UniProtKB/Swiss-Prot annotation:
Catalytic residue list: 251
Catalytic reaction annotation: (S)-dihydroorotate + H2O = N-carbamoyl-L-aspartate + H(+)
Cofactor note: Binds 2 Zn(2+) ions per subunit.
Keyword Zinc: yes
HAMAP family on file: PyrC_classII
Keyword terms, alphabetized: Hydrolase, Metal-binding, Pyrimidine biosynthesis, Zinc
Protein role: Catalyzes the reversible cyclization of carbamoyl aspartate to dihydroorotate.
Subunit composition and interactions: Homodimer.
Pathway: Pyrimidine metabolism; UMP biosynthesis via de novo pathway; (S)-dihydroorotate from bicarbonate: step 3/3
Protein name per Swiss-Prot or TrEMBL: Dihydroorotase
Pfam families: Amidohydro_1
Length: 348
């Protein structure tokens, strides 16, 4: 990577966790991802979740149809795990190159997760098949028991679900997605080579005070929820150390303005327009720009066993203001950092 004071040039990055939705929303948000990233791991939690090969093929085509001419972008599809999922269907999708990975949502942990897994035991035959195939398991790592405080869900998940699972299936490749706590950072750091993590820009930039002090900021509300600053710092320390099993996963999760700014607002930050520059700002603040390219462009392919992208992306130190709104059919989207000035932006 070359890093003059005003320009950062890196291999074209990938986004290892993104929500592209469907319909008009998909058509609106896809270009923000396809313009910058070579590949993206696409989450399967649509209103009708992606649980079959045919559904994944059809969804992939809808995504590709929304990619503007001139964008070189490959969506990597995932299978939504359910208690009743057919392991043979999953294996077929993996062998045919349709499914890159499978996603474990604990039931009711986040948006459109009501079809999710009620217990790991219920899907153990599927997980055993994945271990045998070398197929990565992507995990939303939170318990959803009513008696567990929302700020403790991730740490409790490690103790009660993640560690027993990994003890039982020691060769299973696992991505602990969008980690938010010092517990998770330490757990991944101490783990074996088949355990990795994605980290979002919002969890590196902000903590729960930013969301709650001086008024509630609904566009910082996501799941897992922002934690206290000691957890934010642990995530920053992890990426600044050059740890190679942590990589870029924006968890960009768009919702229309009226679904965010309401008495019961949805969780998710639409950060695709500004995520790469946000990561750059964090790495710069941490004096860790030497590790920026690896986090964005190298660590993910290494874990997934995929080639590094051949193209390049340049970020320039050019202060720009993030728009307040992005038009969406009969509504609008409020992007992450709306109205704020950012230091780094992708050169067009």
């Amino acid at each position: 990577m070359t890093a003059p004071s005003q320009v950062l040039k890196i291999r074209r990055p990938d986004d290892w966790h993104v929500h592209l939705r469907d319909g008009d929303m998909l058509k609106t948000v896809v270009p923000y991802t396809s313009e910058i990233y070579g590949r993206a791991i696409v989450m399967p939690n649509l209103a009708s979740p992606i649980t079959t090969v045919d559904a994944a093929i059809a969804y992939r085509q809808r995504i590709l149809d929304a990619v503007p001419a001139g964008h070189d972008f490959t969506p990597l599809m995932t299978c939504y795990l359910t208690d009743s999922l057919d392991a043979d269907e999953l294996e077929r999708g993996f062998h045919e190159g349709v499914f890159t990975a499978a996603k474990l949502y604990p039931a009711n942990a986040t948006t459109n997760s009501s079809h999710g897994v009620t217990s790991v035991d219920a899907i153990m035959p599927v997980l055993e098949r994945m271990e045998k195939l070398g197929m990565p398991l992507l995990v939303h790592g939170e318990v959803t028991h009513a008696d567990v405080d929302i700020f403790d869900r991730e740490a409790r998940f490690i103790d009660t679900v993640m560690e027993p699972l990994r003890q039982r299936l020691t060769a299973l490749k696992v991505v602990f997605e969008h980690i938010t706590t010092k517990d998770a950072a330490q757990y991944v750091r101490d783990g074996s080579d088949n355990l990795a993590a994605t980290i979002t820009p919002q969890h590196l930039m902000f903590n729960r005070n930013d969301m709650l002090v001086g008024g509630i900021r609904p566009h910082l509300y996501c799941l897992p929820i922002l934690k206290r600053n000691i957890h934010q710092q642990a995530l920053r320390d992890l990426v600044a150390s050059g740890f190679t099993r942590a990589f870029l996963g924006t968890d960009s999760a768009p919702h229309s303005r009226h679904r965010k700014e309401t008495r019961c607002g949805c969780a998710g930050c639409f950060n695709a327009p500004s995520a790469l520059g946000s990561y750059a700002a964090v790495f710069e603040e941490m004096n860790a720009l030497a590790h920026f390219e690896a986090f964005c462009s190298l660590n993910g392919p290494q874990f997934y066993g995929l080639p590094v992208n051949t193209g390049w992306v340049e970020l320039v130190r050019d202060e720009q203001q993030i728009p307040e709104n992005i038009a969406l059919a009969d509504d609008s989207l409020v992007p992450f950092l709306a109205g704020e000035t950012v230091r780094w932006s992708v050169k067009k």
